[in-house]
Swiss-Prot record:
The lineage of its organism: Eukaryota, Metazoa, Chordata, Craniata, Vertebrata. One of its GO terms (cellular component) is nucleus. GO terms for biological process: cornea development in camera-type eye. GO terms for molecular function: metal ion binding; nucleotide binding; nucleotidyltransferase activity. Transmembrane segments: none annotated. It is found in: Nucleus. Mg(2+) binds at E73, E75. Putative nucleotidyltransferase required for several aspects of embryonic development including normal development of the eye. It is unclear whether it displays nucleotidyltransferase activity in vivo. Binds single-stranded RNA (ssRNA). This is Putative nucleotidyltransferase MAB21L1. InterPro entries: Mab-21-like_nuc_Trfase, Mab-21_HhH/H2TH-like, MAB21L/cGLR.
């Protein structure tokens, strides 16, 4: 048993050093290329409208606010200033979303975003995004990369297609630190020892973001209140949870396997599903020793089996907001197909670790 475990870990490490690292290097190169173009577009936007200041800064070889969705798809979160005169309200009526309401006694004119406040005093995510989209469209025509970048049509999101190869969504957002949403108040679960009080305090201090984007839990039937709502996002908090042991290595393996074998019709699976399932696996295996290097194979198999179960049940709950289903709106046939493909992959890795050389 131990020999089989060690063999699997050996082949996974080999796969990580060869395939995962080359994937990372290729994506880093793409990110540099993409961020040059996006920075140039955002510089033009800022000239036209100084309230939209580019926050796409490089720190320690990372671009702040950039998320990799897949090797050709990225999201850049553009942090806006001065949320201060608004109250953050998440009463659970819109899963995964919250609203920003003008604080009592505050005048509209005190807000930097005065013309985006609705009659009932809400700061409208849709109105801000609509204005931003117009500015980006103008900037694309003026910027020095105008030959290689164009707007993606037929969407209310702000998306750029670069060199006909990459798609980048630019999402206006507010950073919320020092508060924690009510809809995530159940976390951490009292009976689970992970991640421990110190890490919990760090995660909550990271806070969350409010994004101006279509909320997929609302799926097409948006009332005006819903289109004014902001989408909750916990990227920094989630990253902090995955520090230590082989957690990040495990996620890197899953992303690489997804990119190579689970990029399927209907796009049922993305990297965020993988990140979510690693967090759930941490709860199931709360001891640090469960994430030692020699447990890598067990953890990876556990996550792949959990993924198959989620696909078969057609439900993958968001880690911090379990009422939000990350498979919402995905075609059932695509989820079924993904379950079959994931099962084939898991069986192959488990029964014949050497097959990783070909995967």
């Amino acid at each position: 048993m131990i020999a089989a475990q060690a063999k699997l870990v050996y082949h996974l490490n080999k796969y990580y050093n060869e395939k995962c690292q080359s994937r990372k290097a290729a994506i880093s190169k793409t990110i540099r290329e993409v961020c040059k173009v996006v920075s140039d577009v955002l510089k033009e936007v800022e000239v036209q409208e100084p309230r939209f200041i580019s926050s796409l800064n490089e720190m320690d070889n990372r671009f702040e606010g950039l998320e990799v969705i897949s090797p050709t798809e990225f999201e850049v979160v553009l942090y806006l200033n001065q949320m201060g005169v608004f109250n953050f309200v998440d009463d659970g009526s819109l899963p995964g979303c919250a609203v920003l309401k003008l604080s009592d006694g505050r005048k509209r004119s005190m807000s930097l975003w005065v013309e985006f406040i609705t009659a009932s005093g809400y700061l409208s995510a849709r109105k801000i995004r609509s204005r931003f989209q117009t500015l980006v469209a103008q900037a694309v025509d003026k910027c020095s990369y105008r030959d290689v970048v164009k707007m993606v049509a037929d969407t209310s999101e702000v998306k750029l297609r670069i060199r006909d190869r990459y798609v980048v969504q630019i999402t206006p957002a507010f950073k919320c630190t020092g508060i924690w949403p009510r809809s995530a108040a159940h976390w951490p679960l009292p009976h689970i020892p992970w991640p421990g009080p110190n890490r919990v305090a760090e995660v909550k201090a990271e806070g969350f973001n409010l994004l101006s984007k279509e909320c997929y839990s609302l799926n097409g039937k948006q009332s005006s209140a819903e289109s004014d709502a902001w989408v909750l996002q916990f990227a920094e908090a989630e990253n902090r949870l995955l520090l230590g042991g082989c957690r990040k290595k495990c996620l890197s393996l899953l992303k690489t396997l997804r990119d190579r074998h689970l990029e399927l019709p209907g796009q049922p699976l993305n990297n965020y599903h993988m990140k979510t399932l690693v967090s759930y696996e941490c709860e199931k295996h709360p001891r640090e020793s469960d994430w030692d290097e020699n447990c890598l194979g067990d953890r990876l198999n556990g996550i792949l089996l959990q993924l198959i179960s989620c696909l078969q049940c057609r439900r993958c709950p968001h880690y911090f907001l379990p009422n939000l289903d990350l498979f919402q709106g995905k075609p059932h046939s695509a989820l079924e197909n993904a379950a079959k493909q994931t099962w084939r992959l898991a069986r192959e890795i488990l029964t014949n670790p050497k097959s990783l050389e070909k995967l």
